[in-house]
Curated annotation (Swiss-Prot):
Gene: pgk
EC number: 2.7.2.3
Name of the protein: Phosphoglycerate kinase
Gene3D superfamilies referenced in this protein's UniProt entry, alphabetically: Phosphoglycerate kinase, N-terminal domain
Lineage: superkingdom: Bacteria
Subunit and interaction comment: Monomer.
Length: 387
């Protein structure tokens, strides 16, 4: 994948526009989870260190486009950055007709979604963004699958368009896992619905030596083997699709499960064979034997791609399956890449972040890359690298 990298450029004295992913949860004016800002800090610090005139921006939440709304302001992010950086940091609300930035100063441009035409990749808006800078740095992998003015359009018109360190690392890690993986390659796809992950399952069934399914997805595969799943979340209309995948790829289906009669944090868990699920029960986790089988598979893997838990790990009684799988990935010597919101929450819960080779910051973008789709922002950077 050939793109210009920010790390290959001399940014001294240049006006640098960084599109980061600073879309963080905010409560009462305070950032409540700083993972995305922390991930973006090295890019910002590198540009400042090089003596660039640095602007950074992002979307935050889902405001009505074209309207300022204090609730979605980047002010909490600015306050966070002021605490972390020794450089002066200021928020600029109106910047489309130009902004003065001093060397060594960080200017945060207010939420891009306050600008009319952002989501539609409006050409006039894209040109206004591009006029603000000498170098455009796309560093928001999480929005690379969307063709929007601040992620895609600006890059077509800026003098130079490049990939920031975070985006470059993400593309390298995903390329390593998907293009020429060390084998055996094991892919774990969890989550509630087969329908939302069908193309992912299909793509991975062609790449992975072993495909592991978990959560509600696994229930559809259990049903495909002719077992009753009781009141479990599953998709009856996709049972035939699950049967097809079982014939094309090695997919271990749970042999034992943890069930409950209600979907509740306090519901007691009953461990039983997959043959014995009653009509009033729902499967909320895989059983110990199934979890150990998966742990063995993961122990021998050379590449692991992990997207989604294998049970309702948010409920302590139904956490064990995901915990065993998570620890097996952490203990494995394989190159491991993990992505998706639930997966990141599980990694935090079990404290294994430092044992995963690469943690992807992109949710939808991560899945679309895995599906083999072209990400508009990446395609734009590749195109600009040719000029």
């Amino acid at each position: 994948m050939s793109v210009i990298k920010m790390t290959d450029l001399d940014l001294a004295g240049k006006r640098v526009f960084i599109r980061a992913d600073l879309n963080v949860p905010v409560k009462e004016g305070k950032v409540t989870s700083d993972a995305r800002i922390r991930a973006s800090l090295p890019t910002i610090e590198l540009a400042l260190k090089q003596g660039a005139k640095v602007m950074v921006t992002s979307h935050l939440g889902r405001p009505t486009e074209g309207e300022y709304n204090e609730e979605f302001s980047l002010l909490p992010v600015v306050n966070y950055l002021k605490d972390k950086l020794s450089n002066p940091v200021r928020l600029v609300k109106d910047y489309l007709d130009g902004v003065d930035v001093a060397e060594g100063e960080l200017v945060v441009l207010e939420n891009v979604r306050f600008n009319k035409g952002e989501k539609k990749d409006d050409e006039a808006l894209s040109k206004k963004y591009a006029a603000l800078c000498d170098v455009f740095v796309m560093d928001a992998f999480g929005t690379a699958h969307r063709a929007q003015a601040s992620t895609h359009g600006i890059g077509k018109f800026a003098d130079v368009a490049c990939a920031g360190p975070l985006l470059a690392a993400e593309l390298d890690a995903l390329g390593k896992a998907l293009k020429e993986p060390a084998r055996p390659m094991v892919a774990i796809v969890g989550g509630s619905k087969v329908s939302t992950k069908l193309t992912v399952l299909d793509s991975l069934s062609k790449i992975a030596d072993q495909l592991i399914v978990g959560g509600g997805i696994a229930n559809t595969f259990v049903a495909a083997q002719g077992h009753s799943v009781g009141k479990s979340l599953y998709e009856a209309d996709l049972v035939d699709e699950a049967k097809r995948l079982l014939t094309t790829c090695d997919i271990p289906v749970p042999t034992d499960v943890r069930v409950a009669t209600e979907f509740s944090e306090t519901a007691p868990a009953t461990l039983k064979s997959v043959n014995d699920v009653k009509e009033d029960e729902q499967i909320l986790d895989i059983g110990d034997a199934s979890a150990q089988q998966l742990a063995e598979i993961l122990k021998n893997a050379k590449t692991i791609l992990w997207n989604g838990p294998v049970g309702v790990f948010e409920f302590p009684n139904f956490r064990k399956g995901t915990e065993i799988v998570a620890n097996a990935i952490a203990d494995s010597e394989a190159f491991s890449i993990a992505g998706g919101g639930d997966t990141l929450a599980a990694i935090d819960l079990f404290g294994i972040a430092d044992k995963i080779s690469y943690i992807s910051t992109g949710g939808g973008a991560f899945l679309e890359f895995v599906e083999g789709k072209v990400l508009p922002a990446v395609a734009m950077l590749e195109e600009r690298a040719k000029k």
